[in-house]
């Protein structure tokens, strides 16, 4: 590109202390991305796949932010669109993004019609020993009493920068569940934002990550409660080691009129090593009295009693750390319905973390 694109990403809904420089991130992008279409496999007849420019794409706000839309505009392709056409829960789709070296942008739109369920699994892979970047934006709309389940694993090479974005809207009694494993990419900008518009709608996010080898993770997750008796849960579980860094922003926003709403945000971090950067901003915004919001974070090294227990069974400290770290990843990975995808995660993690030899 002749002029680099200056992007503001992962911006908090409300600024905190500016001197911390954690309210948002600024990225200079000087590439011209190529449109990348996923390979799509659909099981069952309750879903259709098309490619098109999506009307109303801009009306759904995403976690990484509107500046990321510009990469899709530069690439100029048509979004993959998945829509339900029946009321079956057995139908699911697997989308694979297998990148060579280079710079790419992709968009995916999910639409679950009234009383239907849409199940989608996404695999981001490739880029091993190659430099590049990938921008993947997913936006979802769940009509009344519809449910969307998204399972995403990011297994990119360490020389890749990944922009992994999500935005969703739920109508009355609708629900969105987002499960993500962020294991690759040297630099990751990930986020999600969901608007719970309808009464008794819900959102759940279960995010796992393992950052090492100088990886940098920058994340922003927001849920906005509009409707009465809406519920949300965001669970973030991760491991930091080998000079890695992580910035996580988690916001629960109770808007006027959402009486009876409940929101929970939890973060659990295992820190293996001393040269690490761990930053967290848990934020609760409230314009309504009759609501319940909770957030909590636990972080630190393995407890001495755990290490003692494992060492008494002949497991050295380094192996014990690998066992406990793997258990956190497995807890998220086990939520993914496709065995073949779970095996891809196991292969990516490698045999060095296998615990069979020590038990």
Would you name each region that the model predicts?
Residues 60-308, 312-313, 336-359:
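Conserved beta-strand/loop scaffold segments within soluble protein domains that form the structured core
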Residues 1-77:
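Long, low-complexity, mixed-charge
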Residues 303-306, 322-330:
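Small/polar glycine-rich anion-binding or flexible loop at a beta-alpha turn
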């Amino acid at each position: 590109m002749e002029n680099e694109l200056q992007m503001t990403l992962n911006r908090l809904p409300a600024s905190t202390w500016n001197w911390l420089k954690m309210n948002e991130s600024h990225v200079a992008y000087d590439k011209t991305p190529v449109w990348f279409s996923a390979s799509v496999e659909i099981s069952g007849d309750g879903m259709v796949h098309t490619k098109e420019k999506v009307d109303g794409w801009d009306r759904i706000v995403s976690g990484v932010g509107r500046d990321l839309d510009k990469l899709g505009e530069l690439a100029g392709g048509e979004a993959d669109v998945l829509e339900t056409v029946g009321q079956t829960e057995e139908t699911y789709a697997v989308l694979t993004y297998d990148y060579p070296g280079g710079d790419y942008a992709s968009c995916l739109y999910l639409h679950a019609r009234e009383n239907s369920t849409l199940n989608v699994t996404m695999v981001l892979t490739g880029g091993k020993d190659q430099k590049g970047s990938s921008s993947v934006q997913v936006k979802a709309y769940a009509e009344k009493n519809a449910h969307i389940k998204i399972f995403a694993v990011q297994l990119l090479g360490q020389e890749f920068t990944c922009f992994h974005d999500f935005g969703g809207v739920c109508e009355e009694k609708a629900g969105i569940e987002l499960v993500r494993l962020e294991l690759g990419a040297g630099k990751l900008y990930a986020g999600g934002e969901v608007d719970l518009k309808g009464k008794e709608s819900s959102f759940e996010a279960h995010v796992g990550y393992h950052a090492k080898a100088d990886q940098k993770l920058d994340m922003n997750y927001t849920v906005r409660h509009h409707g009465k008796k809406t519920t949300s849960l965001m669970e973030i579980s991760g491991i930091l080691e080998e000079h890695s860094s992580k910035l996580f922003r988690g916001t629960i926003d109770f808007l006027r009129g959402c009486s009876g709403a409940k929101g929970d945000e939890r973060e659990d971090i295992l820190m293996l090593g001393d040269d690490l950067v761990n930053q967290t901003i848990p934020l609760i915004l409230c314009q309504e009295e009759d609501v319940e919001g909770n957030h909590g974070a636990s972080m630190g090294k393995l407890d001495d009693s755990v290490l003692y227990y494992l060492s008494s069974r002949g497991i050295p400290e380094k192996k014990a750390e690998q066992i406990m770290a793997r258990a956190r990843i497995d807890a998220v990975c086990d939520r993914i319905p496709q065995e073949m995808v779970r095996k891809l995660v196991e292969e990516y993690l490698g045999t060095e973390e296998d615990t069979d030899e020590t038990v």
